[in-house]
Amino acid sequence: MNDLMNLLKERRTYRRFCQKPISEEILAEILTAARYASSAANKQPLSYVVVKTPQRCRRFCREKWAAYLPKKQGQPKAGEEPVLFIGVVQNLKINPNCDTDAGLAISNM
C-alpha cells in the first residue's frame, strides 16, 4: 500500500517528452491498466485508439496544451513532443454518461 501511496503523491503532469519510442510491451501494459479501470454497471463503453506515426503525432502537437499556462510553460518545444497519443473513445450508445469511466481509465494510464 505504501508503494501505491508514494506513486500517487509523486505523480505529476508531463508536458515535455523524450523522443524514445514506446515498446509494444509497455504500450500493452498501459492499455491493460486502462481496461482494468472501473466501469459503471460494467458496461465497458470505452475503446482506445493509438496514434504513433510521426506524421499523425505532429497533427496533435498543433493543438494548444495547458491553455491556462503561459505558452512557454504549456506548449512542448520541438524535440519535446509526445511520440504517441492514446485516444479514449466513448460509445455514448452503450452509456451516455461515461465521462467518469473515461476519467478512471485515463487515471490508470
Give the role of each language-model region.
Residues M1-L27:
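Specificity-determining recognition surfaces
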Residues M1-L4, I30-L31, P76-E80:
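Membrane-targeting and insertion segments and their boundary/processing signals
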Residues K9-R12, L31, K43, F60:
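Alpha-helical structural elements
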Residues R15-C18, A37, V49:
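Compositionally biased, intrinsically disordered low-complexity regions enriched in proline and serine
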Residues I26-I30, A102:
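Alpha-helical scaffolds flanking conserved acidic
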Residues A34:
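Covalent nucleotidyltransferase
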Residues S39-I106:
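Glycine/small-residue-rich phosphate/adenosyl-binding loop
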